[in-house]
Amino acid sequence: MSLNDAYAHCDTLLKEQDYDRWLACLFLPASARKHAHALYAFSSEIARVRESVREALPGEIRLQYWRDVLNAESSDNPVAAALLETVKSFRLPLAPLQNLIDARVADLYDDGFANQNDLEGYCGETCSVLFQLVAIVAGGEANSLSKAAGHAGVAYAMAGLLSILPVHQARGQCYLPENHLKSHGLAREDIGKPESVKQLRAILLDMAQLARDHLQKAQSAVAALPPDVRPAFLPLALVHKKLESIIKNPDPARILSTVAGWRKILALWLASTRT
């Protein structure tokens, strides 16, 4: 498979598995787009490991495969081949990608988070890193991106986690910090019980407001970046309405409905005109 075919595969995979990010990539410079596809496709493959296995061990083996990929010179896997070429072309650091893989190990064991800092750290290692690397691909300087990428990743990841709470519950997962549950008199096993709805609504509201705070800080930091780099942060344009919907109605039994594609494109376009 040629590199062009590998990048085309990443394009197709991302469109199927992470449509929001795929749409956001349309607003990147053409020279950066395929590299963003490779980074996001890699992340998507790592995130899907938990869904594709029934036990932790096969998942560990799959994650180890991707660790080995990062240390390889080449690969027959199209996502891996495109990723390695992107890393090489932009001299991207491997440590953040390795940390992303390591952070996803917790998903295999359905580990929760003791506190808010742990949750924010997970969001940073699985999502902030993507904002950072895509921004570098778009021409940003690594040492100027930390604040924007850090807050952006936490806001984006938390909004995603909060919007599908029932899905996680069905899998036996919980991404709500244990100390927040305890402060409202709940334990992890209480999630889903009718008598816990009032407390869970309060927790969801708190977490959505926290994510909104990160979003506002991210937007301020992005505004200070060079205009050519700001499109790397366009996925944030899809976060605001999601968080406002949760804040307006923090229903723990609700999965946020999918927004029509044209509305997403409009939101991204409007955001792109302000960059």
Region spans (language model):
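Helix-coil boundary and interhelical linker segments in multi-pass alpha-helical membrane proteins
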Residues: 140-144
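A broad structural signal for alpha-helix termini and local helix breaks/kinks
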Residues: 138-139, 163
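Acidic/His metal-coordination segments adjacent to aromatic residues that form catalytic metal sites
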Residues: 105-118, 193, 197
